[in-house]
Regions:
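Active-site-proximal beta-strand elements of phosphoester/diester hydrolases
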Residues: 2-11, 113-125, 149, 184-188, ...
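Acidic/histidine-rich helix-loop elements
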Residues: 8, 39-57, 126-140
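Divalent metal-coordination and catalytic microenvironments
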Residues: 9, 32, 37, 81, ...
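Active-site environment of divalent metal-dependent phosphoester hydrolases
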Residues: 11-15, 39-43, 78-90, 109-110, ...
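Core catalytic region of metal-dependent phosphoesterases/phosphodiesterases
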Residues: 14-111, 259
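A short acidic, glycine-rich active-site loop
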Residues: 51-60, 206-218
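Binuclear metal-dependent phosphoesterase catalytic core
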Residues: 108-112, 208-211, 218-226, 239-284
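Active-site-proximal loop/helix segment associated with metal-binding centers of metalloenzymes
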Residues: 114-211
Length: 284
């Protein structure tokens, strides 16, 4: 058995993190996956002082968990999401240096006999922060969304990357010719036209053009269809599970799971990599 916990879109909400840490302490999973949008929106003051959520709040609590669990401390795989400023990678790197987690974006990592891949970027959104946004399969931008070449970034990137980079190209480079039959992909974006990317855009128009209610990545969808990894993990679209009545889907043989949730609770997904189709989700 390779027991895993998965959460996403916690947005720095301390109560959700406390519930997650309590579950990890009680259940002693082999791995914990953090699927992006980890940081507080607007960075409110932290209890007890400090302004860096990762270093001043999360880091000490992960250290406490490691001290409590000892050798049973889980492998923690983390990516950022589109609401997380890339400038905070410095703090995430510091937590990795301390051995508390691994920043998985753009990397292939190992968990026993399983390969773990992380990818944080999402297709263009209506929001201004573009650190983790890419064109999807082309330079097309849905009505109402803002191009990755516009908006703002907390960390500068080369103009060519902004203009020509795509999720499709990134995934080809990330996976190469690897055998993905025992691979887990930790994404922030869900795949397009699934139960996991259904947004509350019904009857909405921009300049009389109806908006697509599916806002996931076409590139991720095609990648999963073609390469068939064992499991894909997703977040980003908080309301999807409520609107589609499901937090999981399948693309061929690939099990696709989402931990996004639009209520106040923590959505905690539990799964075993030896039987991911038996995954469960609990609202805590």
């Amino acid at each position: 058995m390779t027991r895993c916990l998965f959460v996403s879109d916690l947005h720095g909400q301390l109560e959700r993190y406390e519930k997650l840490l309590a579950a990890a302490a009680a259940e002693r999973p082999d791995a914990l996956f953090l699927g992006g949008d980890l940081l507080p929106l607007g960075a409110p003051p932290l209890p007890g002082g400090g302004s860096d959520f990762l270093l001043d709040w999360l880091g000490p609590r992960l250290e406490d968990l490691r001290e409590r669990l000892g050798p049973a401390y889980p492998r923690v795989f983390a990516i950022f999401g589109n609401d997380d400023p890339r400038a905070e990678e410095v703090s995430l790197a510091e937590l990795e240096t301390r051995g508390l987690l691994v920043h998985a974006h753009g990397r292939r990592l190992q968990l026993g006999s399983f390969s773990i891949y992380g990818y944080a970027c999402v297709p263009p959104t209506p929001f201004a922060l573009k650190d983790w946004e890419r064109y999807d399969v082309s330079r097309f931008v849905d009505p109402g969304c803002v191009s990755p070449e516009e908006g703002y970034r907390s960390v500068p990137v080369p103009d060519g990357e902004t203009k020509w980079g795509t999720i499709a190209g990134d995934l080809v480079a990330l996976a190469g010719a690897d055998d993905l039959s025992r691979a887990v992909f930790l994404f922030h974006s869900p795949p397009y036209r699934t139960r996991l990317d259904r947004a509350a855009l019904d009857d909405r128009e921009v300049d009389k053009v109806p908006l697509d209610v599916h806002v996931g990545s076409i590139a991720i969808r095609r990648f999963v269809e073609e390469r068939q990894p064992l499991v894909t993990l997703h977040g980003h679209v908080h309301e999807a599970a409520r609107l589609s009545s499901s937090w999981q889907d399948r693309i061929g043989a690939t099990v696709c799971l989402s931990a996004a949730h639009d209520g106040p609770e923590l959505a905690l997904v539990r799964f075993d990599l030896e039987a991911p189709e038996a995954a469960t989700r609990e609202l805590l």
